[in-house]
Amino acid sequence: MNFKPHDYQKTAIDFIENNDRCALFLDMGLGKTVSTLTALYDLENDYKLKTANPISPNGKSNFTKTANRFSPFPCLVIAPKRVALTTWTDEVQKWDHLKHLDVVSAAGLTPAKRRKVLKEAHDIYVINVDVVPWLVEFFGKSWPFNTVVLDELSLFKSPSSKRFKSLKKVIRQSKRVIGLTGTPLPNGYEDLYSQIYLLDGGERLGRTLTAYRERFFVPDKVNYQTGVVYSRKLRSPESKTKIDDAISDICLSMKAKDYLTMPPLTINNITLSLDPKTHKQYKELEKEYILKVDTENITAQSAASVNMKLAQLANGAVYSESGEVVHIHDVKIDALKELVETSTGNILIFYEFKHDFDRIVEAFKSLKPRKLESAQDLKDWNDGNIKLALCHPKSAGHGLNLQAGGNVIVWFGLPWSLELYQQANARLYRQGQTNGVIVHQLIVKDTVDVDKVEVLESKEDRQEAFLKAFKRRVEGTL
């Protein structure tokens, strides 16, 4: 297929070519992969031309930038496993101008097979993010990659993660680093530090995380007895502007709504009510779970533990201490039945817990619901052959194209993570979708479901909004 880049893709390609270390904050559907591959293709051609003619007719060097003295290859692409398995290799085969690029995926291989692939000569090597520590140890000081592409830069948002600590040791040896993400701030501005550090070594936001925090943040939730800081907030409204300005020279941000003519996206919150008996049972269990928490010192960890139980209750079943599934209600199952009966198209259901999946499959067994796992499952969905598809949002992230199979999403249980939520919805609502997408969200009134909607819609720091919502639930229960 002949590649005719849109103007926004030309902008992205030029930005990569003109910035040795950069990040593209591009919404889903704007073509991050093909833009990056095209930039690498252009850079390689430019390198070959200048190597053949190092001196221009006026006697000056054709190599105006240090990085241009090197080929962009070998290039390492680090991506989520599903993306690493097929997306980059498929993209090269899709476009005529890229077909000569030698791209190999080492994702999902045994260590022995992975070593074999990495010892072979290729232009681009693609690995899954989970093996980054192994990869760094494997190469040691002999890091061979001229370019590193971080295809989901936000996967490196945690400075305490093994993947960040490992890559930090070697990434300065690469001449070019390209970060790609549509969600650079999944939980707020604190998440930005380690992502930018991999690009500039701390030049813009500070050499250490501590320095970054002291400059731009103040403690929010603190245990004053121990001095432990549980969460932070921006020091002032100006802090956001200062951070944005500091990284603006190496970060390009583009929103799909500004560049794509997309069909409408409709969010439909379906509010459900428990009958009095079930509501009483829910509130009793809610109180039981909350009473186990140190309400004077609520942490994100303790809040998350209780909220998981409360989310199970809202969905209709809970796991007992022995691991058995205890049925509570079928309010969401009944609502889902109504949606299925009235829908003419195929439906993609995002579930939250294993018992959600089991109950949905049992309730709709006559429709033979399918979990989207294998390549064949994805093909059958996109061919329109699956009426009811189920997927966990963590399995429906970056690089999964499902827009051909349908235009209806049902959230049986919403996630807390905005990143998961946006990425999952973007499996159907992306470039190539020809119909308006409707996202049904099953929300049980007076439960933690309401808190989830509030957090996802909040413009506050995600962690802060999460804790605020939980504290309000505690106060309303005790």
Regions found by a protein language model. Give the residues of each.
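Conserved Helicase C-terminal RecA-like lobe
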Residues: 1, 18, 31, 35-47, ...
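Conserved P-loop NTPase motor "coupling/switch" region that bridges the ATPase
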Residues: 67, 72-74, 120, 147, ...
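Conserved helix/coil segment N-terminal to the catalytic DExD/H
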Residues: 110-145
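Conserved pre-motif I regulatory segment
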Residues: 1-25
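A conserved SF2-helicase RecA2
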Residues: 416-478
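Conserved helix-turn-beta segment of the N-terminal RecA-like "Helicase ATP-binding" lobe
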Residues: 83-109, 199-202
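Conserved Walker A/P-loop ATP-binding site and its immediately adjacent core
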Residues: 72-94, 186-191, 353
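SF2 helicase motor core recognition
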Residues: 133-137, 187-189, 356-359, 378-382, ...
